[in-house]
């Protein structure tokens, strides 16, 4: 009986054990979880709690200042007040934005668009700038209502002030927000995704130097996002100061000379490469980009006069008669003609087998002309003749030595111009090169295009003894001087350069020179006029008809340098649709040289 009782007891115990076992397992599991949470996960939860309590904020540095060659400030900084929000501390977004809309007097739907867009781009407990550059009224009303605006701060930030505004816009450029593409190209911009960076001009070209490095501030926050204490700060590093070669007083005065007309000017020292003035007209005021008004900025980009387009480095124009000295030089170098050899100019040039004449600008022609007279009076027929005897295979490579058809790398958005040859025409036009193309090229027309900067560099090489200089617009960065670079052009006979320079003096000082109107014995200037065709016209009647459309009128060009005895500056001016290089562009160049020499 006892044995049977024992088996019954064991059976009962087994059943009790099997019944309680799952509860025991659950109890052990719960104990281990508590142990894990209290011991092993304690540090993790402490970190999470800290992350909810401690906020890491970027501290943006002031951008470096920009000075002119005389240490006058061109671009400095001013402090603005921005409204920054941390959405995690806001319980009701709609209620928050309604109140904020009333305080800052901005429509709620406008605030919502910015708020929800920024919200979608950030991680939890990150902040973003909702409103920039609050005015005094907005600032006062927000501060008075801080208690009703959880997660809200007013942060000081920096904006740019371009002191001379519109006249220096083509040089300084402007700031804006980096796009995803910008950040992809330059990952360093990622830290500045909520701040403006350089998007054009010097601000873009030297953004890495001007921008500085971001710092960080670690703050303890209360439940509403208010700052309880600043725990630590990793300081930011200020951007580097840049000194330009630009003379801002000269820049201002020359910009006014254009009087709103479309055009460009480059003033460069032929022996140093320093650019003393760079004008693109019309221009824009870079300070306009501080107001953050998207629609108004959009209208600026759509302006038909293209104020954001830097004509001095990106505008491509037929060099017209300003190319003739180089055609003359290659003809001398190739022994196609001598300096004193004369050609009869009767106003027309005929090619065998072609019934259409190539006409000169002066009816009846210039009579018998040697190279000096041909350049002084700008004889087209003379240069038709020597271009005909040359080939594009000799002209194009020679012009390339003087910088035509290639970028000088002054700015990223600089144009290369067009230096056409047989290969170019076949590739671009699907046509063979004709002798007529070479003839047109001989007077700087046809397919050839150049920027004002390229023309300035080519003339600098003419007068400095055959050195193609690299232009410099930055003189120093944080006190460290930029390097001067030049490339020697191979000239067979240096006397040929002297012949060309004598001719350029005659352009101004000869009684029949095309720029005799700017002759001044007190400051002797040499140079070359040019009239760049916008539309090719074959007869005078058609020309007068075309002139009625201002946009189809010829461009006025002049390249000048001085003083003749010891040239220190080369100036190129182009006035779009200005028609007369001697009457419109030459006086601007003369003014520039006079101002530079004062």
Question: What is each residue range found by the language model?
Answer:
Residues 1-293, 316, 393-403, 521-522, ...:
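Periplasmic/cell-envelope proteins involved in peptidoglycan metabolism and beta-lactam response
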Residues 2-7, 75, 221-230, 271-321, ...:
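Beta-lactam-recognizing serine transpeptidase/beta-lactamase-like catalytic domain environment
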């Amino acid at each position: 009986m006892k044995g049977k009782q024992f088996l019954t007891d064991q059976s009962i115990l087994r059943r009790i054990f099997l019944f309680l076992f799952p509860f025991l397992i659950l109890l052990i599991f719960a104990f281990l979880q508590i142990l894990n949470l209290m011991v092993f996960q304690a540090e993790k939860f402490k970190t999470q709690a800290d992350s909810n309590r401690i906020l890491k904020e970027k501290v943006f540095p002031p951008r470096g200042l920009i000075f002119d060659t005389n240490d006058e400030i061109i671009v400095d900084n001013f402090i603005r007040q921005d409204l920054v929000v941390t959405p995690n501390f806001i319980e009701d977004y709609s209620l928050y934005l309604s109140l904020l809309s009333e305080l800052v007097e901005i429509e709620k739907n406008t605030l919502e668009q910015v708020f929800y867009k920024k919200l979608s781009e950030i991680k939890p407990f990150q902040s973003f700038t909702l409103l920039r550059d609050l005015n005094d009224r907005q600032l006062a009303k927000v501060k008075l209502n801080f208690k009703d605006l959880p997660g809200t701060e007013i942060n000081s930030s920096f904006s740019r002030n371009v002191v001379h505004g519109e006249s220096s816009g083509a040089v300084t450029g402007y700031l804006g927000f980096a796009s995803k593409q910008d950040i992809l190209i330059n990952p360093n911009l990622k830290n500045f995704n909520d701040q403006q960076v350089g998007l054009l001009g010097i601000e873009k070209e030297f953004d890495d130097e001007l921008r500085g490095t971001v710092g960080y501030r670690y703050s303890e926050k209360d439940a509403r996002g208010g700052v309880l204490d600043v725990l630590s700060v990793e300081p930011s590093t200020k951007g580097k100061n840049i000194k330009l070669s630009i003379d801002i007083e000269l820049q201002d005065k020359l910009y006014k000379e254009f009087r709103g007309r479309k055009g460009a000017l480059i003033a460069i020292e032929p022996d140093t490469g320093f650019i003393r003035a760079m004008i693109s007209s019309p221009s824009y005021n870079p300070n306009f980009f501080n107001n953050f008004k998207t629609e108004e900025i959009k209208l600026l980009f759509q302006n038909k006069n293209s104020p954001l387009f830097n004509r001095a480095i990106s505008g491509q124009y037929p060099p017209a008669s300003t190319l003739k000295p180089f055609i003359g030089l290659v003809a001398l170098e190739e022994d196609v003609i001598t300096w004193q050899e004369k050609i009869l100019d009767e106003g027309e040039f005929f090619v065998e087998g072609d019934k259409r004449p190539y006409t000169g600008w002066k009816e009846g022609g210039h009579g018998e002309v040697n190279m000096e007279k041909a350049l002084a009076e700008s004889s087209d027929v003379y240069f038709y003749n020597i271009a005909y005897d040359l080939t594009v295979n000799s002209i194009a490579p020679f012009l390339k030595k003087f910088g035509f058809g290639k970028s000088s790398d002054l700015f990223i958005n600089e144009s290369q111009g067009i230096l056409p040859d047989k290969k170019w025409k076949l590739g671009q036009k699907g046509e063979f090169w004709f002798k007529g193309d070479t003839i047109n090229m001989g007077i700087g027309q046809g397919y050839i295009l150049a920027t004002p900067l390229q023309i300035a560099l080519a003339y600098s090489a003419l007068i400095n003894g055959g050195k193609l200089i690299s232009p410099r617009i930055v003189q120093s960065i944080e006190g460290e001087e930029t390097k001067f670079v030049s490339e020697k052009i191979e000239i067979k006979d240096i006397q040929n350069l002297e012949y060309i320079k004598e001719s350029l003096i005659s352009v101004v000082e000869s009684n029949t020179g095309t720029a005799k109107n700017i002759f001044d014995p007190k400051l002797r200037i040499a140079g070359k006029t040019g009239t760049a065709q916008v539309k090719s016209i074959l007869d005078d009647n058609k020309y007068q008809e075309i002139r009625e459309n201002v946009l189809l009128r010829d461009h006025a060009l002049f390249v000048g340098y001085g003083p003749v005895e010891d040239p220190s500056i080369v100036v190129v001016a182009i006035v779009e649709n200005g028609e007369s290089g001697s009457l419109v562009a030459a006086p601007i160049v003369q003014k520039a040289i006079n101002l530079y020499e004062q």
